[in-house]
């Protein structure tokens, strides 16, 4: 079956959504060989993945993932990664700020692959538990408002793609679909995308898959999140409509900053800077990039009417130590891990 689909792709044809679903199932069942997996994703990358293909892959991934019952009022802040900018874990910092304001956050992530510090790495450095089971994650969401969903725990079938992904070394469709397959089945998200050419395809995909409000962001300085140092291209899916606009720090009440103040060399430095943001002692650029990304998340969650209002709420949460109090709450060993 996969040989037939590979041949079709090699001839320059695209896959239907159903065929893409079949292909991804072959990958996740262990039926596909490493060579077949590498060939498939390489062909798609060179030719350009279609919305049908992305949607088929995501549906297959969602059908095989372990899920948690998180309710309808949960949001995720994550990115495709691979921006190469060596910034601290901004989306993780934003998740803490957002959860301090009463919005439940199911933070989907992993360890570092190409970055200096993955979200799992920095949480461990901060002394925050990573729930060891879906049950523990659900409890963390209910008691603390934020749970980290460690991707390998929920996407065990993706282990078959690990070898080819590592050997290939370049970004493929697998980098795109991870954020679209949150185990909490979030309908509202902020997703950082490393290239604007993918943001519209991902928005179309999420519209097809039934998302309510998803904001895709790409900094023009290469960040896969809202930048404090440059304009950010935004593609917004809201209630079935897709719109595009450009976001600047100044347009939401912030001053433009410098990337140097938000860059780190290790997970230790990332954790230290994140904590400094929460207690208000970090450089202004680090505080503002956190408030900017948290503000977009508050807007996507429906907590704020506009991004500017969300940014103001987020910055206030940092300045009055609400976010720092949430960081301390997350550190407390109250969650009992499931088996």
Swiss-Prot record:
Record's subunit section: Homodimer.
Quick one: which pathway? Amino-acid biosynthesis; L-tryptophan biosynthesis; L-tryptophan from chorismate: step 2/5
Q: What GO CC annotations are associated with the protein?
A: cytosol
Q: EC number(s) for this protein?
A: 2.4.2.18
Q: Which residues bind anthranilate 1?
A: 79, 110
Protein residues bound to anthranilate 2: 165
Q: Where does Mg(2+) 2 bind?
A: 224-225
In its UniProt entry, the species of origin is given as Geobacillus stearothermophilus (Bacillus stearothermophilus)
Per the record, the GO terms for biological process are: L-tryptophan biosynthetic process
Please verify whether the record's keywords include Ribosomal protein: no
Q: According to its UniProt record, which cofactors does this protein need?
A: Mg(2+)
UniProt remark on cofactor binding: Binds 2 magnesium ions per monomer.
Its job: Catalyzes the transfer of the phosphoribosyl group of 5-phosphorylribose-1-pyrophosphate (PRPP) to anthranilate to yield N-(5'-phosphoribosyl)-anthranilate (PRA).
Q: Please, which domain of life does this record's source organism belong to? A: Bacteria
What is the protein's name according to its record? Anthranilate phosphoribosyltransferase
Tell me one Pfam family matched here. Answer: Glycos_transf_3
The UniProt similarity line reads: Belongs to the anthranilate phosphoribosyltransferase family.
Q: Where does the chain bind 5-phospho-alpha-D-ribose 1-diphosphate?
A: 79, 82-83, 87, 89-92, 107-115, 119
Protein's UniProt keywords contain Disulfide bond: no
User: Which one of the record's GO molecular function terms can you name?
Assistant: anthranilate phosphoribosyltransferase activity
């Amino acid at each position: 079956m996969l040989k037939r689909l590979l041949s079709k792709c090699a001839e320059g044809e695209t896959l239907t959504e159903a065929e893409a679903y079949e292909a991804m199932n072959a990958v996740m069942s262990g039926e596909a060989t490493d060579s077949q997996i590498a060939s498939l994703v390489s062909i798609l990358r060179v030719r350009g993945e279609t919305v049908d293909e992305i949607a088929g892959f995501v549906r297959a991934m969602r059908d095989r993932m372990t899920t948690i019952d998180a309710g309808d009022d949960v949001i995720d802040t994550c990115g495709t990664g691979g921006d190469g900018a060596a910034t601290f874990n901004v989306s993780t910092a934003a998740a803490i700020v957002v959860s301090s304001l009463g919005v439940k956050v199911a933070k989907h992530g992993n360890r570092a692959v190409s970055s200096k510090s993955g979200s799992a790495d920095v949480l461990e450095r901060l002394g925050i538990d990573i729930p060891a089971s879906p049950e523990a994650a659900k409890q963390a969401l209910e008691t603390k408002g934020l749970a980290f969903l460690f991707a390998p725990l929920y996407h065990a079938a993706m282990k078959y793609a690990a070898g080819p992904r590592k050997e290939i070394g370049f970004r493929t469709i697998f980098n795109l679909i991870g954020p679209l397959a949150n185990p909490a089945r979030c309908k509202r998200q902020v997703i950082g995308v490393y290239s604007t050419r993918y943001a519209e395809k991902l928005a179309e995909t999420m519209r097809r898959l039934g998302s309510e409000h998803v904001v895709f962001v790409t900094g023009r300085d290469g960040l896969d999140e809202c930048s404090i140092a440059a304009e950010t291209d935004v593609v917004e899916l809201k209630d079935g409509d897709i719109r595009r606009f450009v976001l600047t720090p100044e347009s939401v009440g912030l001053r433009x900053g410098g990337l140097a103040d938000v860059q780190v060399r290790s997970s230790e430095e990332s954790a230290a800077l994140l904590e400094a943001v929460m207690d208000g002692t970090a450089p202004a650029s680090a505080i503002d990039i956190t408030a900017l990304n948290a503000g977009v998340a508050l807007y996507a969650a429906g907590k704020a009417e506009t991004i500017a209002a969300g940014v103001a709420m987020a910055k206030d949460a940092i300045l009055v130590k609400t976010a720092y109090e949430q960081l301390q709450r997350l550190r407390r060993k109250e969650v009992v891990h499931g088996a």
